[in-house]
Amino acid sequence: MAVLCFVAVCAGQANKPFPVVSTVDQPEIAGRPVQLDAQGKLLPWPMPDNIGYSYSSHVLTQWQILWDQYNRQRLPYYYCCFDFDRTTFEMFPDEHWANSTGYLRAMLQGFIERLYPYTGDARMLVFLQDFVDYELENGLTPQGYAWPQVPYASANPGAKRYTGWSAHGEDYIEPHVVGEDGYAYLRLYEMTGNTKYLQAAIRCADALVKNFKPGDEKNSPWPVRCYARDGKADGGPMGPYSANVIEPIMLFDELMRIGRGNVADYERIRAGAWDWFQKYPLVTNTWVGYFEDVSPRMTNMNQVIPLEFARYVLLHPEKDPQWREHARKLIEWVKTTPKWPKYIVHGATVTTEQGDGLEFCCNEPNQCCDSHTSRLAAVEALYYAKTGDESYREAAFRSYNWVTYFQGLSGGAHTPFGPQWWFTDQYADGPRRLMDAFWAVPEWAPADESHLLGSSSVVTKISYGKGSITYSTFDPQSIDVLRLDFAPASVSAAGKLLSVRKDLDAPGFVFDESTHVLRIRHDSEKDIDIQGNAGQAPPLYITFDDPHLPAGTELQGQYPSGVIDWGSGEWQIGVPQGKFGTFNLSLADASATTAKFSFYSPRIFVGVDVYNGGSEAAVVTVHSPEIREMSCTLKPGELQRIRTGWRDPSSSVIFDLKNGGKLRFDNLAYRRD
C-alpha cells in the first residue's frame, strides 16, 4: 500500500512542520487536466457533466485491469507495487517492497462483493475465488502454532509462498489482518456457498479467541504484529498495540449473526474487545497499528482505523447507540488532526494516509493515494445517507470526484521516490469504497442503466434482462437499493408480490418516479424478481482489454473470437490516453475518412464511447447497410458516449469521419437481438 513510501518520505521531511490543511489548486490530478464547474469546484473525470458515467467508469476500469492481470501476468499474487512502460503501457513489478497479501484479499473481496451485483458479471467470482484460494494454499500458518492455519499479512516481493516480509522478521502474523481476512472469507462463503471459506473464517475467529488478552492503554487485546509460532510480540518490528480491533469484531459479529462456529466464545471475546475499544482508542484517539510494512510506533497515527469503524457503525447503528456522534467526531478528527497534512483541491478534501505530526505519508495530493480519500468520501456519503446532512453529501461528492482522476493507468500517479504506484490503493481499496457512493447516493449511479447498488445482505446471484432484474440474497431479510432504466410493474419475493409503500417500515418497495431509484424490503424470502415495461437489455461490451493485444497491433479478422471481423489493417489497438484509462481502438491510418467492421452474425450495434484528441471538431457518422445513419460532432478534448438507438440487427457498421485522425474508441456495445 502507500505506506511503502513512509520511510523514504520521512527521511526528507523530518522535523519540517507542515500546515494541517492547505489549498493545492493544481491544473492536473494524476497527470489529467482538472475539470471544474462554474464556481471553480472539481468535477469528475472523464465526463464532467455525467457523474454516473464517470463513477461507473472508475470501478469498471479498475476491474478490467484486474481481469487482465488474472488472465496474463498475475502480478498481484506476488507483488504489491507496479509501474508501466510509458510507451507500451505494459505493467512490471517493483522487486523491492513487501507484498501486501492479507488485506489485499480482504479489500478485493469487499470490492467484488459490491461490483458483482452491480454488473452481473460472473467472471468476477472466478477471479476472486482463485485469488483467495491461492492464499489458502500458499499463505497460511502451520498447524500446531499458537496462531494455527491463519493468513500471513505479507510476503517478500516475488515470493510464491507467503510467510511475512523478511525486513520485519520471519514467520509472523498480524492479528487484525487475521480478523480482516477472516471476515472476507466469511463473506465469500456467503457469496458462493463454498464451505471451505466458512471453515477458513472460523479458524481465524478461533485463533483470535485463543490469543485474546484484556488489554490496557499500551496493550491491545491482540498485538499489532507477533510471531505465529508462539505469539510473542517482543522487540523490533513486533509490537503490543493496534487500535484495529474492529475487523476482528466484524468477523465475530457476522459469525454470531449466522450462528456458525463457537458462538458463545465469540460473544465473550467480542464484548471484551468492544469494551477495550470504547475505553481506550475511542477516548484517546490513539489510532495506530494498521499497515503491514511499518514498524510499530505509538505516535504514528492513521486514518484507516477510525474511518472503517465509523463506516461500520453507520451501516450497523444497532451496534453502537452513539453511532451518530462517534461517526461525526471521527470524520472531523481525520480532517483536522495535525498528524498528517490534508489538502483542498478545487474544493475537494484530500487526505493523506498516516503521520506523527512531523513525518507523514505520502507525497503531494495529486500524485497519490486515492484510496484514503475514497474512504473519507465513503464515510461522509454514508453519514449523509443516515442523517440527511447535505454538507456531508457535498463533501463526499467533491472528494469522490478527485478519486476518479486515478482510474485506469494514470501516468501521473506515482510515489514520492519513483514512478511506480500501489496496486492495493488503486485497484482494491479505492474502488471498493467508491462503490459506497452508489449505495449512499443512488442518484450518482448511471441514469440510463439498471444496477443493484447495495444490499444489507450479500447477493449470491443476479441476472439483468430487458425491463427485468432477478436476484437472490444470502439472507431472507434484506433492504436492497437499485436504480433502474425502467419503471417496475411488479416486485415479488419468492413469487409473492410486494406492495408499493411510502416507506420501508414493513416489507414492500418504494419507487421514486423522478430518479428511478427503487428500494426494496423483504423479510422472509431470498429470491427477488423485478418486472417492468420498456427498458433495454444490458448490452455486451468489447473493451479492447480482453483479450489483451499489444499497443499498435493492427486488427486482422476476428476480435474477440467469433464476434467481430475488423477487416485488414483499418483499426489498431491504442494505448491509454486522453480520457480513456485503458487500451482502446484507433484508426491505423490517421488520414482515413471511413472505416468499418462486420459482425460474424447480425447484431444490434448499440454504440461506442468516442474521444476526440485532436485540435479541431470531429464529425462521426455511423450507418449500416440495413439502418439509417446517425451523426455526432465532438469538440476538441470531448468524450461522448454515442448511442445509436438502433433496434434492428446489422451485418456491418460503417464510420464516416471528418477530422477523425485523433479519435479514440472504447467500450463498443452490442446486443444479440
What are the roles of these predicted feature ranges?
Residues 14-104, 122-168, 203, 207, ...:
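Low-complexity, Ser/Thr/Pro/Gly-enriched N-terminal "stalk/linker" regions
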Residues 35-47, 93, 97-117, 170-190, ...:
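Well-ordered alpha-helical segments within folded domains of soluble proteins
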Residues 65-73, 206-207, 211, 268-298, ...:
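Non-catalytic carbohydrate-binding regions of carbohydrate-active enzymes
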Residues 444-538:
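C-terminal beta-sandwich/jelly-roll accessory domains of carbohydrate-active enzymes
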Residues 477, 600-607, 650:
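Extended extracellular/luminal ectodomain segments enriched in beta-structured repeat modules
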Residues 538-600, 623:
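N-terminal targeting leaders for non-cytosolic proteins
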Residues 627-673:
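Terminal, low-complexity interaction segments
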